[in-house]
Amino acid sequence: MEGLTDRQLEVLRFIASQIEDHGYPPTIREIGEALDIRSTNGVNDHLKALERKGYLSRDPVKSRALIPTSAAREALGGGGEAGSNVVPLVRGPARPGSRMIEIPIVGRVAAGMPILAQERVEDTVQVDAFLLGTNKKVYGLRVQGDSMIGDGILPGDYVFVKKQLNADDGEIVVAMIDDEATVKRVYFEGDRVRFQPSNPRMAPIYVRHSDFRSTMILGVVVGVYRKLT
């Protein structure tokens, strides 16, 4: 594995710390501001180097898709057993002293025709804190339906949700609409709010701002887990 410069290590450490603290990676602009890198091109140069050297996995079309690999975990002092595309998940209580955090699984949520989410804890799972951070407001929901397949969220997946009552434009949220829970991207458009599926065969849900009190954002999706067997 090719070594890192001091600056590259600094960038990698900042990305990892943001995931640890907030449950999601920083944007390119946030990296530049935090580390006094004046241009986005400068940040991108460091990110490309980290990716080329095998320390970072990234999606060029998504600003927050910066995932440290197992090699990065080793470089930063963590374990390296899991692949960069795997969310470690174990049922039952977390072992004392481990880096695993316990996530409650709360009912089910529709990613298609909305169904009522059962607001009760059905199970708990363990997830590596390096991937989701240590935020205690994260919970899991099981997805039904295929309206979010364009974002890689498939029927039977678990979405990990950071509990909050607001969201930024374009984020994937769990929302309660007319007492029904659903997973969609949210867009604020003038006098209405659009909840957009990523399956092109499905239509968006529109809610007028005047009716928004009957629509509650339950949280922002910060991760997805899929069983492979």
UniProtKB/Swiss-Prot annotation:
CDD domains: S24_LexA-like. Keywords: Autocatalytic cleavage, DNA damage, DNA repair, DNA replication, DNA-binding, Hydrolase, Repressor, SOS response, Transcription, Transcription regulation. InterPro entries: LexA, LexA-like, LexA/Signal_pep-like_sf, LexA_DNA-bd_dom, LexA_repressor, Peptidase_S24_LexA, Peptidase_S24_S26A/B/C, WH-like_DNA-bd_sf. Signal peptide: none annotated. The keyword DNA repair applies. One of its GO terms (molecular function) is DNA binding. Its EC number is 3.4.21.88. Transmembrane segments: none annotated. SUPFAM superfamilies: LexA/Signal peptidase, Winged helix' DNA-binding domain. Pfam families: LexA_DNA_bind, Peptidase_S24. Residues 28-48 bind DNA. One of its GO terms (biological process) is DNA repair. It catalyses: Hydrolysis of Ala-|-Gly bond in repressor LexA. Belongs to the peptidase S24 family. This is LexA repressor. The lineage of its organism: Bacteria, Pseudomonadati, Myxococcota, Myxococcia, Myxococcales.
